[in-house]
């Protein structure tokens, strides 16, 4: 390990959800006052691997990368600090050091605000350190106010943890119980993000629509009220929130999609299965008809809203009839975008010990069938945008010279040829071509905002 004074370069590798991306940015913010600047892995004196534990091969991916970093560290005579952060760190703790003794630090998802102290402890004691505690004080309260600009589209964590305990999911064990940040702290961070150039803010949480935070006057706000307060921030043009649970989609939040003009007409609402029997075994505590009702109420409140979702196929005990129910829900609902996965066992979760695991070949066939329908729906949704005009938030140059790229209200990448549009600009465009994963557009004369 090198001395603190000489270790001032940093690389953070991030796997997993948008919350992990947010956490990685905040880790960089925590370390910036110590003089750390971000560089490529091969040039870094400290490497942080911010891990995800959702998929089956998460640990294998981690230890493969740790093997590569071990060789790099040894080539420098040990002059590199290696840290494992995030959900695998939280779940496996000391096991990481047992399998990879060249790791210097294992820091859980609730402790990264303590990075300066942990680094100092490593330097003082000349040994590896583990911190996977769930402290009573929320980490958000202890993070520095100064943070790097995220650009025109920014993410803001307002809630963390999960109390739902779905039988397939590790999040309650790696992120802890549901905790909501106070509204005042969220509003203050949002204003800082806007001052730093953000035009769109996406609110983050494992169950973001479960947020019920303390208001400035000591009362409790729900997410709909928070969105209304955020909409009053000058310079903020767009709002989103993710990820939601159907059980927490209340009437006030559905009404917000009708009443809040800054709330974008796109919602990610995971359902996982269309079978009531499988939803019960997943401990989702809702049925497929609740999801159908919510989708209908959202579309009644905001006719132009588009939905995305998550699906798991091959969950233990899933029959052909159960899978057919999922396919029926998909066809009836229609999704602009969806993420689908084969069920994978997560150690320590109830479903991992179920006796009626599904054969991998059956999982593969079901996933292929589901993804074909979801892909067709996404392509159809994109094709339906051709000829429409709407605002695009431009974020920077496109992949080819002379292009400008941005995001539609539905999160689709939109590209305009022969345009040099500054990042952060909202312009009305007309969609002229659809691709499977993006849209091509031409500019109209009206500029919505600059």
From Swiss-Prot:
Enzyme Commission number(s): 2.8.4.3
Main location: cytoplasm
CDD domains reported for this sequence: Radical_SAM
Residues where [4Fe-4S] cluster 1 binds: 17, 52, 87
InterPro entries per UniProt: Elp3/MiaA/NifB-like_rSAM, Methylthiotransferase, Methylthiotransferase_CS, Methylthiotransferase_N, Methylthiotransferase_N_sf, MiaB_methiolase, rSAM, rSAM_horseshoe
Cofactors required: [4Fe-4S] cluster
Top-level taxon: Bacteria
The Radical SAM core domain, residue ranges: 148-380
The UniProt record lists the keyword Iron: yes
SUPFAM superfamilies to which the protein is assigned, alphabetical: Radical SAM enzymes (SSF102114)
Residues the entry annotates as binding [4Fe-4S] cluster 2: 162, 166, 169
Top class in the EC scheme: transferase
Reaction equations catalysed: N(6)-dimethylallyladenosine(37) in tRNA + (sulfur carrier)-SH + AH2 + 2 S-adenosyl-L-methionine = 2-methylsulfanyl-N(6)-dimethylallyladenosine(37) in tRNA + (sulfur carrier)-H + 5'-deoxyadenosine + L-methionine + A + S-adenosyl-L-homocysteine + 2 H(+)
Domain MTTase N-terminal: 8-124
Domain TRAM: 383-445
Quaternary structure (record): Monomer.
Family label: Belongs to the methylthiotransferase family. MiaB subfamily.
Protein name: tRNA-2-methylthio-N(6)-dimethylallyladenosine synthase
Organism field: Acidiphilium cryptum (strain JF-5)
Gene: miaB
């Amino acid at each position: 390990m090198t001395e603190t004074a000489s270790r001032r370069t940093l690389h953070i590798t991030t796997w997993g959800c948008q919350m992990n991306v947010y956490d990685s940015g905040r880790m960089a913010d925590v370390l910036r006052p110590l003089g750390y600047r971000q560089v490529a892995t091969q040039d870094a004196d400290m490497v942080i691997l911010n891990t995800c534990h959702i998929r089956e091969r998460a640990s294998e991916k981690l230890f493969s990368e740790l093997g590569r970093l071990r060789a790099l560290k040894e080539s420098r005579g040990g002059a590199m600090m290696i840290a494992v952060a995030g959900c695998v760190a939280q779940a496996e703790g000391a096991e990481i050091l047992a399998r990879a003794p060249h790791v210097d630090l294992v820091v859980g998802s609730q402790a990264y605000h303590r990075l300066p102290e942990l680094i100092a402890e490593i330097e003082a004691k000349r040994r590896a350190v583990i911190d996977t505690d769930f402290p009573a004080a929320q980490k958000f309260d202890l993070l520095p106010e100064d943070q790097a600009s995220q650009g025109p589209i920014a993410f803001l964590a307002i809630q963390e943890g999960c109390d739902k305990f779905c039988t397939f999911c590790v999040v309650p064990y790696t992120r802890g119980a549901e905790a909501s940040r106070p509204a005042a702290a969220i509003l203050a961070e949002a204003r800082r993000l806007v001052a730093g150039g953000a035009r769109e803010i996406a609110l983050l949480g494992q169950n973001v629509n479960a947020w019920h935070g303390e208001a400035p006057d000591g009362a409790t706000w729900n997410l709909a009220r928070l969105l209304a307060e955020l909409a009053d921030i000058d310079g903020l043009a767009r709002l989103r929130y993710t990820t939601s649970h159907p059980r927490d989609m209340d009437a006030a939040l559905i009404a917000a999609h009708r009443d809040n003009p800054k709330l974008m007409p796109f919602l990610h609402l995971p359902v996982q299965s269309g079978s009531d029997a499988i939803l019960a075994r997943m401990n989702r505590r809702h049925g497929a008809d609740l999801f159908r009702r919510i989708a209908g109420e959202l579309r009644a409140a905001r006719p132009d809203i588009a939905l995305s979702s998550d699906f798991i196929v091959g969950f233990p005990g899933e029959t052909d009839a159960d899978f057919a129910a999922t396919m029926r829900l998909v066809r009836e609902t229609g999704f602009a975008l969806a993420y689908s996965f084969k069920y994978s066992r997560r150690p320590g979760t109830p479903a991992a010990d179920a006796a009626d695991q599904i054969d991998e070949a059956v999982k593969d066939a079901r996933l292929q069938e589901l993804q074909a329908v979801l892909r067709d729906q996404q392509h159809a949704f994109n094709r339906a945008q051709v000829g429409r005009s709407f605002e695009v938030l431009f974020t920077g140059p496109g992949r080819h010279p002379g292009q400008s790229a941005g995001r539609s209200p539905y999160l689709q990448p939109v590209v305009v040829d022969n345009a040099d549009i500054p990042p952060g600009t909202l312009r009305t465009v007309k969609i002229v071509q659809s691709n499977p994963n993006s849209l091509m557009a031409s500019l109209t004369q009206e500029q919505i905002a600059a």
